[in-house]
Regions:
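Non-transmembrane "mature" sequence context
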Residues: 1-65
């Protein structure tokens, strides 16, 4: 697992509270990604990875995204 993904998962776990729910989050359609799953956005390339990271960090530190 790369460091960027590791940090995202750490933040998600802190917000969501369970590894199982973090795994579900990655595979669930998300309105912030035009109903695409975060995993699909992540897998689309560097821009997708940055988009997912920005979303999670905004939710963690800057309020709801």
């Amino acid at each position: 697992m790369n460091e960027q993904l590791k940090q995202i998962n750490i933040h998600l776990h802190a917000m969501i509270g369970s590894i199982e729910y973090v795994q579900r989050w990655w595979l669930s359609p998300n309105i912030s990604f035009q109903l695409r799953c975060p995993q699909e956005v992540w897998d689309s390339g560097v821009e997708g990875r940055d988009e997912v990271e920005a979303f999670v960090m905004q939710a963690a530190y800057g309020g709801g995204a």
